Amino acid sequence: MLGTVLLLALLPGITTLPSGPPAPPFPAAPGPWLRRPLFSLKLSDTEDVFPRRAGPLEVPADSRVFVQAALARPSPRWGLALHRCSVTPSSRPAPGPALALLREGCPADTSVAFPPPPPPSPGAARPARFSFRLRPVFNASVQFLHCQLSRCRRLRGVRRAPAPLTPPPPPPPSRCLPQDEACADTGSGSAEGLAADGPHLHTLTQPIVVTVPRPPPRPPKSVPGRAVRPEPPAPAPAALEPAPVVALVLAAFVLGAALAAGLGLVCAHSAPHAPGPPARASPSGPQPRRSQ
């Protein structure tokens, strides 16, 4: 009986186990467009040169830093807008002490300068560049530059107004960062303008190592009104002539020889005589008489 029940349970289609809904599929991996960076933020201590660095930029305090923001992959369909930039002692762009550099693409610090824009690539947006002086505002050896950027999509099939016969006068020079035409809110409907607090803002952060150069040694204190006279150099020791040296050596040799001879004579005269053997009696002398 038990074997029959087990056999029926193993047969397909006769199991009494409840069949639930099928399990949902495992979420697929994100597409390649999610893994690729949209922007690049580079720092340099030299204008127009932004090499790839293995570590953070290292600059002395109160020196100029050059910044370049660009699209990671240039495309004729996208434009770039640089909205805000600031320097903080924290790696997180949280509200707190910060040195504001840019607001809405305009300088917020007197040291911010915009170099002439580089020549654009065919069909690509120009990178945004500016420079600032890293003043010693924060007492931190590592500081962080935070920049907010946005990407604007160019619309296709938009008709542009015909160019006038007489060119208009050049616009006055702007003190703000020139934005790409796709991100400039011109109101002509040819592009999509983005506000500074829009949902398409991206914040990029780059660390900066700040070094403090050693001050030069201080000069000695001097009495006011008196000029400090340089100390004369110490005279070099004069070289000895060979003739006096030879005479001194000969005199020392003669004195040493005379002293040795005198000591030898003194020792010879003051030494005691050695005792000799006892004297024998001569045979011719008187002999003792024999007793009878």
Curated annotation (Swiss-Prot):
Alphabetical GO biological process terms: cell migration; epithelial to mesenchymal transition; regulation of transforming growth factor beta receptor signaling pathway; transforming growth factor beta receptor signaling pathway
UniProt PTM: Glycosylated.
Designated name of the protein: Transforming growth factor-beta receptor type 3-like protein
Organism: Homo sapiens (Human)
Residue stretches spanning the membrane: 245-265
Tissues where this protein is expressed: Expressed in pituitary gland gonadotrope cells.
Keywords carried by this UniProt record: Cell membrane, Disulfide bond, Membrane, Signal, Transmembrane, Transmembrane helix
Residue ranges of the region described as Disordered: 160-236, 273-292
Annotated compartments: Cell membrane
Keyword Transmembrane helix: yes
Membrane-side (Extracellular) residue stretches: 17-244
GO CC aspect terms: plasma membrane
Chief localization: membrane
Signal sequence, start to end: 1-16
